């Protein structure tokens, strides 16, 4: 029992005691106390966790199934509508192709007809152009004849419209020709009276004829001088306003005269007795 009284390590009474600082009221103890309690091991098992979340998992699976069914319905509807639209488009394409083929056929037909009509028109136009050129040539020859001999040389009874047209186009020449015609009529009446009173002898008739020829030459020279003054107006009016024979109508079928040989133009007044046609020209 000696070890109880001595401070020997071998003796229990002789051992030293140690004193530790407590942390009961420190911040560390407060933080340890604020920690949550550890769950029990039964609550951490897999079957317990699955039983707690089974309702949510089932609800999610149901929602996914509903969404999938709705999407499938929409897809089916879109497919049916797309199929219907494709059928209508194919039908429209077939109709369009048939219409296009008909249009191509009609176009080829109309093109052939138009080409044929164009050729006919060109041939008719060439014929009309030739006839117009012939008529212009005849008009130019007629105007040359009128400007050389005057409008008095056109027979008013046979060519009333031509003489009227010439009087409208050339009033000055028509006035001069009227005065000349009056003078010719007065000379003609005098010649007829002289011829009736002097029918006794052939020599006196010949002398009267020569006098009448002299008077006619005098009037013709006077008319030619008047015509020479109006020749310029004739030529100027020809270029600006050519003679148009479209207003002249004939009851029979018209014939085209290429030269003046086929045109019968006579003098509008009676010729004095005993005068030849060569004396007038």
From Swiss-Prot:
Any idea where this protein resides?
A: Cytoplasmic vesicle; Vacuole; Cytoplasm
Recorded superkingdom: Eukaryota
Q: Where is the composition biased (Polar residues)?
A: 172-213, 221-235
State a GO cellular component annotated for this protein. vacuole
Coiled coil (residue ranges): 67-92
Q: Which UniProt keywords apply?
A: Coiled coil, Cytoplasm, Cytoplasmic vesicle, Transport, Vacuole
Task: Please state the protein's primary subcellular location.
Answer: cytoplasm
Concerning its family, UniProt says: Belongs to the VAB2 family.
Describe the function of this protein.
Component of the biogenesis of lysosome-related organelles complex-1 (BLOC-1) involved in endosomal cargo sorting.
On subunit structure and binding partners, the annotation says:
Component of the biogenesis of lysosome-related organelles complex-1 (BLOC-1) composed of at least BLI1, BLS1, CNL1, KXD1, SNN1 and VAB2.
Supply the name of the protein. Answer: Biogenesis of lysosome-related organelles complex 1 subunit VAB2
Species, as recorded = Kluyveromyces lactis (strain ATCC 8585 / CBS 2359 / DSM 70799 / NBRC 1267 / NRRL Y-1140 / WM37)
What is this organism's lineage? Eukaryota, Fungi, Dikarya, Ascomycota, Saccharomycotina
């Amino acid at each position: 029992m000696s070890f109880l009284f001595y401070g020997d390590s071998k003796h229990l009474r002789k051992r030293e005691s140690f004193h530790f600082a407590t942390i009961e009221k420190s911040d560390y103890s407060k933080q340890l106390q604020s920690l949550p309690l550890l769950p029990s091991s039964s609550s951490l098992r897999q079957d317990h966790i699955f039983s707690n979340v089974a309702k949510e998992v089932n609800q999610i699976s149901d929602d996914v199934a509903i969404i999938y069914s709705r999407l499938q319905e929409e897809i089916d509807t879109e497919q049916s509508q797309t199929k219907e639209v494709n059928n209508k488009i194919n039908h429209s394409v077939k109709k369009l192709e048939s219409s296009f083929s008909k249009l191509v056929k009609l176009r080829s037909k109309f093109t052939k007809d138009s080409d044929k009509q164009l050729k006919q028109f060109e041939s008719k136009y060439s014929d009309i152009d030739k006839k117009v050129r012939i008529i212009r040539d005849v008009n130019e020859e007629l105007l040359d004849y009128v400007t050389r001999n005057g409008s008095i040389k056109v027979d008013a009874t046979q060519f009333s419209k031509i003489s009227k047209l010439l009087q409208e186009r050339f009033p000055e020449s028509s006035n001069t020709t009227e005065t000349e015609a009056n003078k010719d009529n007065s000379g003609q009446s005098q010649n007829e009276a002289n011829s009736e009173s002097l029918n006794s002898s052939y020599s006196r008739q010949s002398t009267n004829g020569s006098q009448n020829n002299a008077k006619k030459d005098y009037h013709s020279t006077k008319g030619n001088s008047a015509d020479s003054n109006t020749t310029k107006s004739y030529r100027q009016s020809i270029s600006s306003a050519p003679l148009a024979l479209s207003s002249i109508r004939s009851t029979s079928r018209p014939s085209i005269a290429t030269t003046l040989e086929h045109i019968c133009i006579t003098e509008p007044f009676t010729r004095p007795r005993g005068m030849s046609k060569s004396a007038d020209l």
